[in-house]
Amino acid sequence: MQHASANSPAAVEHCPPDLHYLIEQQVWARVDADEGHATVGITALGIALAGDIYMCRPKRTGTVLAQGDAIAVVELAKSIVAVRSPVSGEVVQVNPLLEEQPERVHQQPYGEGWLVRMRLTDWDTDRGQLLHGDDVVPAMRHHAWLNRLES
């Protein structure tokens, strides 16, 4: 599977501006505060740093999580890694495509590769830990530099 490397401009520079990012965990949330919901996924940089994802198992519908709790488990070539939630809430939908097509996570990390949809329970507190807008790309560059992979 080909995807962006951790040092590639695509992994670092393409961060949709409408999302909120928990940089240290390399996850994002597309928040609809009016509706009280968020769609959650893994960043392109997070995927580039992790490598190929062979299996993705999000938490079940109805699971209640705090910001930073494990929202999914992904199986990589040589390890299994917990994916942390950028927001607190209850899982209300799991991406149905991921069961049969886990590659969607790295093919379209900000589109069809989303993990879960959540009903927000503490957005006012959670948002203080998330980056948004112009602060995101510099933080992604810094995270990529700190976690650069040896060729």
Describe every region a protein language model picked out.
Residues 57, 75, 81-85:
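Small beta-strand-rich domains/subdomains or short beta-sheet motifs embedded
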Residues 80, 125-126:
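Short beta-strands and strand-coil junctions in structured, solvent-facing domains, enriched
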Residues 81-112:
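Mid-chain, well-packed structural core segment of small domains
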Residues 2-67, 112-122, 131-134, 141-151:
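Acidic, low-complexity mobile loops and tails
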Residues 31-34, 94-100, 125:
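Short, conserved beta-turn/loop elements at beta-strand boundaries and strand-helix junctions
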Residues 59-74, 90-92:
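Short, well-structured beta-strand-loop connectors
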